Amino acid sequence: MIIKSSEYAVSAVKEEQYPKDNLPEIALAGRSNVGKSSLINTLLKRKNLARTSSQPGKTQTLNFYLVNDDFYLVDVPGYGYAKVSQKRRQEFGEMIQDYLETRPNLKGLIILIDSRHEPTKDDISMYEYAQYLNIPILVVCTKMDKIKKNQTNKVMTGLRKKLDLNYDHVTVLTFSSVTKFHVTELGNWIEDKISQ
């Protein structure tokens, strides 16, 4: 996928605030601090388009990024951040649920999982929920530069077991925003989904 242009479009917490142009959308979901913003910046070759933070829980809205005037990448608030109140967590959950269930132009969901840790209950719930909704899924193991090369197979085996992955239906990629590992494959998956 060749990136010609990319820009922040809008932040939304409800359907009335979503873009109205019916362009296809690819959403990114994952735990707080898993690397969603870094993945967006790396993929779009922009240093600070999506704000990165070492402090978890910074993204609190659905952030839409217009790419090539052709489709949107949608950064979803991170889940599993303990320092957010129960009420706020519930609001995030409802916002994400409404988006995933009602958005007809959602063409795929990229679920990011930190390669240094096993998938959490929240990761598993998000994966199963997306499957239930029949949303095409790409699972991305982030921060691969932080683990030793000889640990890759162990990480992938653990992920496959924990999520009960069937590779016929779900694509899995390892990824690093530092080394740019699998950026091309990520772009190809997105291109395939938005063209369907």
UniProtKB/Swiss-Prot annotation:
GO terms for molecular function: GTP binding; metal ion binding. Signal peptide: none annotated. GO terms for biological process: division septum assembly. Gene3D superfamilies: P-loop containing nucleotide triphosphate hydrolases. Residues 22-196 form the EngB-type G domain. CDD domains: YihA_EngB. InterPro entries: G_ENGB_dom, GTP-bd, GTP-bd_ribosome_bio_YsxC, P-loop_NTPase, Small_GTP-bd. Its cofactor is Mg(2+). GO terms for cellular component: cytosol. Keywords: Cell cycle, Cell division, GTP-binding, Magnesium, Metal-binding, Nucleotide-binding, Septation. GTP binds at residues 30-37, 57-61, 75-78, 142-145, 175-177. Mg(2+) binds at residues 37, 59. It holds the Pfam family MMR_HSR1. It comes from the Bacteria. Belongs to the TRAFAC class TrmE-Era-EngA-EngB-Septin-like GTPase superfamily. EngB GTPase family. Necessary for normal cell division and for the maintenance of normal septation. This is Probable GTP-binding protein EngB. It comes from Lactobacillus acidophilus (strain ATCC 700396 / NCK56 / N2 / NCFM). The gene is engB.
